[in-house]
UniProtKB/Swiss-Prot annotation:
<feature type="repeat" description="LRR 21">
    <location>
        <begin position="596"/>
        <end position="618"/>
    </location>
</feature>
<feature type="glycosylation site" description="N-linked (GlcNAc...) asparagine">
    <location>
        <position position="679"/>
    </location>
</feature>
<feature type="repeat" description="LRR 10">
    <location>
        <begin position="334"/>
        <end position="357"/>
    </location>
</feature>
<feature type="repeat" description="LRR 12">
    <location>
        <begin position="382"/>
        <end position="404"/>
    </location>
</feature>
<dbReference type="InterPro" id="IPR013101">
    <property type="entry name" value="LRR_PRU1-like"/>
</dbReference>
<keyword id="KW-0812">Transmembrane</keyword>
<feature type="glycosylation site" description="N-linked (GlcNAc...) asparagine">
    <location>
        <position position="392"/>
    </location>
</feature>
<dbReference type="GO" id="GO:0005886">
    <property type="term" value="C:plasma membrane"/>
</dbReference>
<feature type="repeat" description="LRR 17">
    <location>
        <begin position="503"/>
        <end position="526"/>
    </location>
</feature>
<feature type="glycosylation site" description="N-linked (GlcNAc...) asparagine">
    <location>
        <position position="789"/>
    </location>
</feature>
<feature type="repeat" description="LRR 4">
    <location>
        <begin position="184"/>
        <end position="208"/>
    </location>
</feature>
<feature type="signal peptide">
    <location>
        <begin position="1"/>
        <end position="26"/>
    </location>
</feature>
<feature type="glycosylation site" description="N-linked (GlcNAc...) asparagine">
    <location>
        <position position="99"/>
    </location>
</feature>
<feature type="glycosylation site" description="N-linked (GlcNAc...) asparagine">
    <location>
        <position position="688"/>
    </location>
</feature>
<feature type="repeat" description="LRR 27">
    <location>
        <begin position="807"/>
        <end position="831"/>
    </location>
</feature>
<feature type="repeat" description="LRR 2">
    <location>
        <begin position="135"/>
        <end position="162"/>
    </location>
</feature>
<feature type="glycosylation site" description="N-linked (GlcNAc...) asparagine">
    <location>
        <position position="842"/>
    </location>
</feature>
Length: 948
């Protein structure tokens, strides 16, 4: 070939390549216009300024194939992939609907990603519900993390070319949508996790999905026995995920048909019985999780020895009756595992096959009965180990290898370790991100090397015997630390000796130690703090105003020695939901205004606060505890806190009447106004409160903000097996448990209520006030109240017969009042009644007998001299005892008013003594004879004493 021809060929080749490359950058004009219309629509319904599509897809750019989120065919220049995932934005309000007509120009579209778009539905202006059928090449459709419900399912049934359908994290509910997906016979991957599907799986209809290779139904509400459901007809399955549902019964024998199964996740159900032998036939199995079920009997690890592809094995049982044995495992497994979890398996020793495992990344042997010295060899054999969980066992002495550069998670909590930490622990575990040593008996100081753990994010040393000062550079060296809990130790000295604004600390929990000094200003450097708990220490000084500069969610400084006024800035922290300053020596008044509407719990009891209670507290307030202060004035109307549930105002100086406006608080479950000076009558409208007939259903719900009860920490590990749906992830969920306690007098003692028990408690305490008038009949409508205390007032009239409707009542105290009449016999119907006290009233008649009333002693009826029958010693003698009706028209005069009786006795005594003194003042023979008699008596006494 001549050089000229060769040059011509080269130029032709270059020109063709340039044309081809240019074609890759351009696209069909109709599709470019379609993309611009999609952009305009999204911007119109989602106004988030951070939406990245605003900065791309420019109308001036004609080469749409290189736009972000767009993929084109390299030869035809047609758009084959569109991704509109908007996961980084805030959800719009209101939620928009998506117009499907925008996608019809893309006739060659193969993949459409609409995940995290915050859409609630679809509409189709041109083709009704059949529009997706025009996208004949569409194989992958991702609708995950939206607000879709079953209204979009009919649209999906037209997309007959689909091979992958992802619907996770939506609002779908009802049964498995087999009819809506009946035409999708080519479907290979179906992801329905994190929805609200329920009921049993269909039996016959699933055969229409016979090509399914991966099915994920986890985190729904499917139920029933797997033996009666049609899932076994899907014999082509390679992945089956059914975790976190309500399936029950044994693993069905038909599962043995899944010869191609690589992933099987049945965790967190109610499966029971023995684990079947046929799991040894799953020769392709890579991932097998049977965690958190009710399995029992013996399980031989020999069943997994032949699974040569196995990488992940997880097993635990809630029944406590599962026992692992090592038969036919003498030479170890034929596979090298990446993750092994054997929790709640009654293991008394570490399985021997682990000696032969050298590629483990995750080891979980928690919640067993393992004991002895810490198994250092697990770390030495598996140099790539990332997570070791041995919590809830009985290990003792802790020893560590020289180095563990890969270990990220170490949980040794709830064991019996009783030695000091190695001085170089921070250097050995230099890569550690998560350390939990809580609930042991570790001694001594925190080693200074722990201040050099640059990667540590979570550290829990609570409930040990650590002492001494914290390392000086703890908060500067551990600059990745976001969660620190040191509760219930004997640490002393200042809280923070040195800090840096580079520290990312979010949660600081240091309660129940011996820290001293003032609240340090070095806290200001920890600008990301959202949780501070310094309660039960020895802190002094005042509460600094600058604490109000943090974006705190929780602030607890209770039970210290703090003085001075409460800074008003604390009441204006935007997202503060718990403020606990109780048990100090704080003084001054409460701030009149608060700009935060997020506060849930305000606990200021056991201080020296004065002034009135403002009616402008947090709008979202649920719990208000101001007990044992010196507050005065009237009870506030709580107009600005309509959701309040618990109001504790006992032992203050409150006066006036109980406001009728309280009856509008439909969520109240506890009212404690005892030991004040409230007067007038009890309003009859209290029946509108939530523990009465007018209560709302949400009184039963947990009134804590659910999103604030826990701190969820996820640590993603490497992918250990191949998955068609999602890779495995290792996560830890540690509660930030603040144990908010409510103290309420029940059954003649103070009980503590928190969380679950708090939601079940309903009580009203108006004792030790100056209330008068009759007890309202309407109080009998408080059908859910468990404790009612009206003692030590001046209430009159009779005991309402309507009290027989208090079917949940456990404690009823009406003592020290002016009640008269008989005890209603209907009260014997109160089967939950444990404490009943009507002592020191003017009651009369026969004491009712039967059921709970047979358990009450005489103390329940003292001071009622006209009551007769058991348990008093007064017999009714067959005579008709006055019922006291003749006194009902005159509440001020009982037959034997105790007060009048004592006044009469006192007057008589004073009169006699005064008469005797007057008698002695006159000089008369009688007076002289009296003194002679007294002198003679004194002489006789002296003589007797002298003889003795």
């Amino acid at each position: 070939m001549s050089s000229s021809k060769l040059m011509d060929f080269g130029l032709t080749w270059i020109i063709m390549m340039m044309i081809l490359l240019q074609g890759c950058r351009s696209c069909i004009e109709s599709e470019r216009q379609g993309l611009l219309e999609i952009k305009a629509y999204i911007i119109s319904v989602i106004t988030d300024p951070h939406l990245d599509i605003r900065r791309g897809w420019m109308s001036s750019d004609r080469s749409c194939c290189h736009w972000r989120r767009i993929k084109c065919d390299i030869t035809s220049k047609r758009v084959i992939g569109i991704s509109l995932s908007l996961e980084s934005i805030r959800p719009p309000d209101p939620l928009p609907q998506l117009n499907l007509t925008f996608f019809y120009p893309f006739e060659e579209l193969q993949s459409l990603n609409l995940s995290s778009g915050y859409f609630k539905g679809w509409f189709d202006e041109r083709k009704g519900g059949k529009g997706l059928g025009s996208l004949r090449n569409l194989e992958t459709l991702d609708l995950g993390v939206n607000f879709y419900d079953t209204s979009v399912l009919p649209y999906l049934n037209e997309a007959v070319s689909l091979k992958t359908l992802i619907l996770h994290d939506n609002l779908f509910k009802g049964g498995f949508p087999v009819q809506e997906l009946i035409n999708l016979t080519s479907l290979e991957v179906l992801d329905l996790k994190f929805n609200k599907f329920s009921g049993q799986l269909p039996t016959q209809e699933l055969t229409n999905l016979r090509n399914l290779r991966a099915l994920d139904l986890s985190n729904n509400k499917f139920s029933g026995s797997l033996q009666k459901q049609g899932i076994c007809r899907l014999e082509q399955l390679q992945e089956l995920r059914l975790s976190r549902n309500r399936f029950e019964g044994e693993i069905p024998l038909c599962f043995s048909r899944f010869s191609k199964l690589r992933v099987l996740d049945l965790s967190s159900n109610h499966l029971s019985g023995k684990i079947p032998y046929f799991i040894s036939d799953f020769k392709s199995m890579e991932y097998l999780s049977l965690l958190d079920n009710d399995f029992e009997g013996l399980f031989s690890l020999g069943l997994i020895t032949e699974l040569t592809e196995l990488k992940v094995f997880k097993l635990s049982s809630r029944s406590g009756m599962l026992q692992i044995v090592e038969t036919n495992v003498s030479g170890g497994l034929q596979s090298q595992l990446s993750s092994i979890m054997l929790s709640h398996c009654n293991l008394g020793k570490i399985p021997g096959f682990l000696w032969y495992q050298q590629e483990l990344r995750v080891i979980d042997l928690s919640n067993n009965i393992l004991s002895g010295v810490f198994p250092t060899w697990l770390l030495e054999n598996n140099t790539e180990l990332q997570a070791l969980l041995l919590q809830n066992n009985s290990f003792k002495t802790l020893t560590l290898p020289r180095t563990m550069r890969r270990l990220q998670i170490l949980d040794l909590s709830v064991n019996n370790f009783n030695n000091q930490l190695p001085k170089d622990v921070g250097l050995i575990l230099a890569s550690l991100r998560h350390l939990n040593l809580s609930n042991n008996e570790f001694l001594g100081n925190m080693p200074s090397s722990m201040a050099r753990m640059e990667n540590i994010e979570f550290m829990d040393l609570s409930y040990n015997n650590f002492s001494g000062k914290l390392p000086r550079n703890l908060f500067t060296g551990c600059y990745s630390l976001s969660w620190l809990k040191l509760s219930h130790n004997r640490f002393s000295g200042p809280i923070i000796r040195k800090s840096s604004d580079e520290t990312s600390l979010i949660t600081l929990i240091m309660d129940n130690n011996m820290f001293t000094g003032k609240i340090p200003r070095t806290l200001l450097n920890l600008r990301m703090l959202s949780v501070i708990d310094l309660s039960n220490n020895l802190l002094t000084g005042t509460i600094p105003r600058w604490l109000g500069n943090f974006f705190l969610e929780v602030l607890r400084i209770s039970n210290n020695r703090l003085q001075g006024a409460i800074p008003p800035s604390l009441f204006n922290i935007p997202y503060l939901w718990l403020l606990d300053l109780s048990g100090n020596f704080l003084s001054g008044s409460l701030p009149l205004r608060s700009s935060s509407d997020y506060g849930y719990i305000l606990d200021l009891h056991n201080n020296n606060l004065t002034g009135s209670i403002p009616d402008t507290l947090w709008y979202g307030l649920r719990l208000l505890d101001l007990r044992n202060n010196k507050l005065s004035g009237n009870i506030p109307l709580f107009r600005s806190t309509p959701s309040i549930s618990v109001v504790l105002l006992r032992e203050n100086n409150l006066t006036g009447k109980i406001p009728v406006e309280l009856c509008g608080l439909s969520n109240v479950r506890m009212l404690d106004f005892a030991h004040n000076r409230l007067n007038e009558s009890i309003p009859s409208c209290v029946t509108n409160l939530s523990f009465g007939s007018g209560g709302h259903s949400n009184a039963d719900s947990d009134w804590y903000p659910a999103s604030l009860l826990s701190n969820f920490m996820e640590i993603y590990t490497e992918v250990y097996y191949e998955s068609l749906i999602v890779s495995d992830r290792f996560s830890l969920d540690y509660s930030v448990d603040f144990n908010v306690q409510v103290e309420f007098a029940v059954k003649q003692r103070y009980d503590l209520y928190m969380r679950g028990t708090l939601n079940q408690m309903f009580g009203l305490d108006l004792s030790s006030n100056e209330l008068s008038g009759n007890i309202p009949e309407e109080l009998g409508d408080l059908k859910r109240v468990r404790s009612l205390n009206l003692s030590r007032n001046s209430l009159s009239g009779s005991i309402p017969g309507s009290f027989s409707n208090l079917r949940s009542i456990e404690s009823l105290d009406l003592s020290f009042n002016k009640l008269h009449g008989t005890i209603p016999s209907q009260l014997t119907l109160l089967q939950s009644l444990v404490v009943f006290n009507v002592s020191y009233n003017n009651l009369s008649g026969v004491i009712p007998q039967g059921k709970q009333f047979n358990t009450f002693g005489e103390k329940s009826y003292l001071g009622n001299f006209l009551l007769c029958g058991s348990p008093t010693k007064r017999s009714c003698g067959g005579t008709t005892i006055s019922s006291g009706k003749e006194y009902e028209d005159d509440d001020e005069s009982g037959l034997l008013d105790i007060v009048v009786l004592w006044w009469s006795l006192g007057t008589t005594y004073v009169t006699v003594m005064m008469g005797f003194l007057v008698f002695l003042c006159f000089d008369s023979p009688w007076r002289r004879a009296w003194f002679c008699l007294v002198d003679t008596f004194i002489d006789r006494v002296k003589d007797v004493l002298g003889v003795i």
